[in-house]
From Swiss-Prot:
Pfam families: ATP-synt_8 (PF00895). It is found in: Mitochondrion membrane. This is ATP synthase F(0) complex subunit 8. The modification N6-acetyllysine is found at K54, K57. Keywords: Acetylation, ATP synthesis, CF(0), Hydrogen ion transport, Ion transport, Membrane, Mitochondrion, Transmembrane, Transmembrane helix, Transport. It comes from the Eukaryota. The chain crosses the membrane at residues 8-24. Component of the ATP synthase complex composed at least of ATP5F1A/subunit alpha, ATP5F1B/subunit beta, ATP5MC1/subunit c (homooctomer), MT-ATP6/subunit a, MT-ATP8/subunit 8, ATP5ME/subunit e, ATP5MF/subunit f, ATP5MG/subunit g, ATP5MK/subunit k, ATP5MJ/subunit j, ATP5F1C/subunit gamma, ATP5F1D/subunit delta, ATP5F1E/subunit epsilon, ATP5PF/subunit F6, ATP5PB/subunit b, ATP5PD/subunit d, ATP5PO/subunit OSCP. The gene is MT-ATP8. It comes from Hippopotamus amphibius (Hippopotamus). GO terms for biological process: proton motive force-driven ATP synthesis.
Amino acid sequence: MPQLDTSTWFTTILSMFLTLFIIFQLKISKHTYHPNPETTLPMTQKQPTPWETKWTKIYSPLSLPLQS
């Protein structure tokens, strides 16, 4: 069974990493960024809840009229 020749692996792997690095650098350099990024606060709109729009009365058992 023949031996696996690994003498060119270092060159192949190194050239692959170099190529990937160059490709990613080119992709990143073409990306457009905002000139002045500012944090914007989201505009929160307060939704009225049903219990805020109408008056409700909570009856406790002690305030109910006595039933005979």
